[in-house]
Amino acid sequence: MVGVPGSGKTFLAKSLSEKFNCEILNRDLIRTSIFPKKYINHSKLQNNIAFEVLFKVLKQLISNNRPEYIIVDGKPFSKNYEIEEFKNELDKLSAKLIIIHVTASIDIISSRLKNDLKNQYPLYRDPKKDSKIYNTQLMINEFDKINFPHIIIDTSSHIKEVTKYCFNKINEFIK
């Protein structure tokens, strides 16, 4: 899953996991699981450590269990080099990468982020320590245009419609 915070990556991941009966590895969940709550600062270092753990789990699952699909969530993959590094590692494991670029309108993303801020939902981010993401346009501008084959999914519609559309696009993509 690739996309800015608030685009609907986690919501779509959960819905797809039910449709595909697949696993979700979420960097944000890992971060909140391995760092004591009072020390979580959402720094680049903490994000990198959490992603390293996620990738070790991913490698183990691919090497030993070979599930048909694993959704990687909680890491925006905002830069092409991040996607390329991840793809190269998956290639070593003979695993295929399907990039799903999750989008929504700026108004919807802003609304979702404000809702997160209001609810202080700690799984995804700490609004007081990472206020940059609450400037939606600035955040979107910091993302590279994806230079790899990918599926674009707009999560502005009802989740059942979005999931069905995404499911069909994935099936087209893998043919």
Regions found by a protein language model. Give the residues of each.
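Conserved nucleotide-binding/hydrolysis micro-motifs of P-loop NTPases
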Residues: L29-R31, F77, T103-I109, H158-I159
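P-loop (Walker A) phosphate-binding loop of NTP-binding proteins
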Residues: V4
